[in-house]
Amino acid sequence: MKTLITAIVAVLATATVAQAQSAPDLKGAWSGKFRTVILGSNPHHPSSGAADAPRVREITFTFDIEGQDGRLLWGKSWSNPERKEPFVATVTADGRTIIGADTDGSLTMRIGGRSRMDACYVHPATGPSQSIVASCGALQRAR
């Protein structure tokens, strides 16, 4: 009996480790509506001046995951197809959470199934534009 329990525990532990190390195939375009608050101006969110009051916008945001190596992802993201930015990300050990960064901000995503992810993006006023952005939305995989 002790041998059987040990064998079952070993099989379950191996399955859990394998599951934590693998990630679903996420390559392709993911797009959706995001509610965004912007303080200041930048190329993605132009305004009449850098000292503007916070503005709320609804935008369509796209992540094109061009490559994947296990839990590592990379590609381009944009709210304006003329201003695509590179990003890199990784799926965490839970197999559902993604964290990453682009040239001036960071993103957190949660995989909700084969064709849905929830995502949030922020960037601080450390870049040349000195703008601050926070945005969240739901992404659908393009068919």
Map each language-model feature to its residues.
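Exposed regions on extracellular, virion, or secretory-pathway luminal proteins
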Residues: 27, 53, 69-71, 81-85, ...
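Sec/Tat signal peptide C-region and signal peptidase I cleavage site
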Residues: 16-20
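Beta-sheet ligand-binding and adhesion/scaffold domains
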Residues: 22-24, 31-47, 90-143
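Residues that flank catalytic or metal-binding motifs in active/ligand-binding sites
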Residues: 26, 59-61, 135
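Positively charged n-region of N-terminal signal peptides that target proteins for export
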Residues: 1-4
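N-terminal glycine/threonine-rich, aromatic-flanked beta-hairpin/loop signature
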Residues: 41-86
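Beta-strand secondary-structure signal
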Residues: 29-33, 62-64, 74-76, 118-120
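Bacterial N-terminal signal peptides
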Residues: 6-15
